[in-house]
Amino acid sequence: MSAPTDQPPRSEGAQTNSSERSSQQQEQPQQSQSQNVPAKLLQHFQTNRIDSALWALRLLVIFFTVSYVLPIFTSQQSAFSKVMLANAAISALRLHQRLPAFAFSREFLARLFAEDSCHYMMYSLIFFNIRPSLLVLIPVLLYSVLHASSYSLKLLDLIGQNSWWGARFIISIVEFQAANILKATAFCEIFIMPYAIVLAFMNHAGLMTPVIYYHYLVMRYSSRRNPYPRNAFAELRITFEALAARSPPAFAKIIRGGIGFVNRLAPQLQPAAAQE
């Protein structure tokens, strides 16, 4: 009689070894891919220096705004000034991207003042030396969150790791609420106008601050790329007209007088700007 053989255990051991080898082979590409992530990011940053600098500056805006709300590592005045400086640097880089070489001509100046980035740089210059206020920081913060999220998603796609699902989920929420974020920014810019007047009367800002900010609002209202300021003014007008219809005659007259005053201050849109 033949002795029993040990073939089944050997086959199980061979299968175990083969499965271990296959798992090791699968882990090797993942490890090499994770090791290539810093190199990919570094190459991307070197190739897209301006866009990467804009992304970093927007992250600084978010960080210093949080530092303003929670002044643990720095004072509120310092955090406020750094947000304004970072916003001015962002606007300067965007103007460098969008405008040709400087030329002292009427066409160049007209194109310069039509750019949204020029408006945001003017915004930083207006409020750089005033008393710090969270209301002034909100428009800068919302713009930075919106644009930094978009570029962060591009970096996550470049890395190609699914482990960052939490960041992708937050970015998807921001992009889904992009219209509401731009709308909230427009309303904040409008509400800052009476706030600037109050600051001037309380000697917390210069007397020319409301005047200069009015010209800023005029440029935002005439923006060709961002219709949200015009839409915000239209919504406020509808709201106050409805409020005047429900108010007593004396209050209704005051409200309608304010609506007429704001309408007279509104600029006349050019046909090209209205179409865009």
Swiss-Prot record:
It is found in: Membrane. The keyword Phosphoprotein applies. Residues 18-35 have a biased composition (Low complexity). InterPro entries: PER33/POM33_regulator, TMEM33/Pom33. Residues 1-37 are annotated as: Disordered. Its main location: membrane. Keywords: Membrane, Phosphoprotein, Transmembrane, Transmembrane helix. The modification Phosphoserine is found at S22. GO terms for cellular component: endomembrane system; endoplasmic reticulum; membrane. It holds the Pfam family TMEM33_Pom33. The chain crosses the membrane at residues 53-73, 125-145, 181-201. GO terms for biological process: endoplasmic reticulum tubular network organization; membrane organization. Belongs to the PER33/POM33 family. This is Krueppel homolog 2. The gene is Kr-h2.
